[in-house]
Design a protein with these regions (language model features):
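A short beta-strand micro-motif
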Residues: 1-8
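Assembly/interface hotspot detector across virion components, adhesins/toxins, and nucleic-acid enzymes
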Residues: 4, 15-17, 41
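A short, exposed loop/beta-hairpin motif centered on an aromatic-Gly-Thr core
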Residues: 11-25
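Short, mixed-charge low-complexity intrinsically disordered segments
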Residues: 31-47
């Protein structure tokens, strides 16, 4: 899955991980992974 990570200072990054987005449990794991990888993110959105 691919995410856009927004930070409080205004910059953004893209982040991709290798989870199956068609599987609900793996989608949840992908979101958890993104939040754990970027704990200081202001907002994370799916791309």
């Amino acid at each position: 899955m691919t995410f856009i990570i927004h930070f409080k200072d205004g910059h953004r990054e893209t982040y991709s991980n290798h989870y199956d987005e068609d599987n609900e449990h793996e989608r949840d794991a992908a979101w958890d992974d993104a939040y754990m990888t970027f704990p200081n993110a202001d907002y994370i959105e799916e791309f």
